[in-house]
Amino acid sequence: MRVRDFSHTGITVSNFNRAVQFYWDVFGCPLVGVADTPSPRVKSFFGVAADAPSCKIGWIRVPGGATLEIFEFQPQQQPSAGPWNRVGLTHISFNVRNTQRWHDHLVAKGVEIVSKPEKSPRGHTFFFVKDFDGNLIELMDLGYMYHVLKWLGPLGGWIFRRGIYKNYYR
């Protein structure tokens, strides 16, 4: 069995409305759904130990089909940053065209820039920014490889699984 495609990434945010506005103003990603989670569910499913916890959930549509699922909990815990070699998620990434133009756009929007656009050894360009809560976001221009991966990705996966990467499969 195989998954069909990538669905979503969940991010806990400090301010629901600010997150909606940020992802719309900065990246053009609209809010497409909102739900309020009942207190008993916040306690049992999310494990928030408080008298009357709440959770607002929103779905922000990213061009291409994936979604950012945002959560605002009450009460909140303070964010904690970890080093990249910590096991777990490190960042989200958006495919873009022209990373320098995106860099300039985000500087003008006042977004915290972590790194300037640079070229990888494989030829794509990328840079990192942070959202208002400090979540790391990569913007990457894969160049021609975007189309190669989109259209030939399944074939490449089949070939590589049987070829140069076969030792990773049992």
Please give the residue ranges for each predicted region.
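Short amphipathic alpha-helical segments
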Residues: D5-T9, G88-T90
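Core segments of cupin and vicinal oxygen chelate
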Residues: T12-G64
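A short acidic/small-residue loop/turn micro-motif
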Residues: S39, P75, P121, G143-Y146
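A short, polar/charged loop-to-alpha-helix boundary motif
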Residues: Y144-I159
